[in-house]
């Protein structure tokens, strides 16, 4: 298995939402690199198709509620902390950027649950009740891949 180059800093808070096989990369736009990335995308897609073929409907209400809340928690995180939001805001204005993020990119923020960002992540609360806009409250980020080739977490103490 070939590992793509790590794409730069990712906060430890964001890391909890990703698996060890996440594609988080930046590389030179060469034909070979595009082929490698496209091949990885196809591999992901094939596995996704296999998983959806094997999926069965979950009838355990507790599991359904837990899964829905986990998805809502992720969408709520991304809608609030999406690193592309400042660029979108400059391009299309704050109101349109917010709509794009919450109604398209991370649709489900308003329909899957009613908890707010601060309900899930109270450590981001400011004294006035607003959300602290810092990307990381823990202060750790990973500039290098925090997992080895087998998926073992190796990030630990050397996070910067």
Please provide the spans of the model-predicted regions:
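Alpha-helical oligomerization segments
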Residues: 61-160
């Amino acid at each position: 298995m070939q590992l793509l180059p790590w794409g730069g800093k990712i906060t430890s808070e964001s890391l909890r939402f990703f698996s060890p096989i996440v594609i988080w990369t930046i590389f030179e736009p060469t034909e070979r690199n595009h082929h490698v990335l496209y091949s990885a995308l196809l591999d992901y897609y094939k596995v996704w198709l296999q998983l959806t073929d094997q999926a069965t409907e979950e009838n355990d209400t507790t599991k359904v509620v837990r899964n829905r809340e986990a998805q809502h928690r992720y969408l709520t995180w991304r809608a609030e902390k999406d690193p592309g939001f400042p660029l979108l805001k400059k391009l299309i204005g704050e109101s349109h950027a917010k709509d794009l993020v919450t109604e398209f990119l991370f649709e489900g923020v308003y329909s899957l649950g009613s908890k707010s960002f601060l309900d899930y992540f109270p450590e981001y609360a400011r004294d006035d009740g607003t959300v602290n806009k810092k990307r990381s409250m823990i202060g750790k980020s990973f500039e290098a891949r925090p997992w080895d080739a087998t998926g073992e977490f190796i990030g630990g103490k050397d996070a910067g």
